[in-house]
Amino acid sequence: GREIRMLSFGTGKKVLFACAFHGMEWLTTLVILRFLDELLESISKKNFFCGIRTENAFHNRTLCVVPCVNPDGVEISINGAESAGEYCDSIKAIGSEKRWQANATGVDINHNFNAGWKALKALEIKNGINAPAPTRFGGKLPESEPESRAMARLCRNNDFIRAFAFHSQGEEIYWSFGEYMPENARLQGELLAELSGYTMSEPDGLAVGGGFKDWFVETFNSPAFTIEIGNGKNPLPISDLEGIYERLKQMLLISIVM
């Protein structure tokens, strides 16, 4: 029953940032909130930020941010099954609560979007994932979960020119989905990779299909990117926050105004 919040500012064409689709990937939220803190301060003080006068830049851009798509999953990952209320017993029965990526019902939100979902579901079953689990169970139907429905509804009700899904980890940027390659998406991805030092990549196996980025690209034929922040093992430690942020802040700003 936790709320999924969104904040927005600016005027003009809309860009979407969405974080923490997975329980252990809460550092994505902190990186983007750190970015917003510095960005909004630069706007309020009419300062330059990464060489850009941000006050002027947001006269024709609106940034919409969903800091935590999966608040229940994040709480379970950090605080255990007891934080899940009525779902506590079922989560304990599933196990691995400290390695929890799914939502409170054991559905992986980034396997629950309607893009290549049937093929992904067949692959899940082939890999023995056929019931609620800590990760990679895509549910019984696309958009079966309140989190995926909320994100899909948000996108259907807003004309976003591009979208970004922040995950961890691997220092990679995913930009296409199958045969769907929106105009300028590759060029934009190459610019983001150059600014961040991350690698443009294509997912494989159980990482293909069902994801928010996949769905956005297929549904709207507009650029969308998965940004895999940092390197290591999830959950990334909070001590990584400043290093990741400093490396990404220019890329984050350019991703909005480009």
Regions found by a protein language model. Give the residues of each.
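Short, flexible loop segments at boundaries between secondary-structure elements
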Residues: 189-205
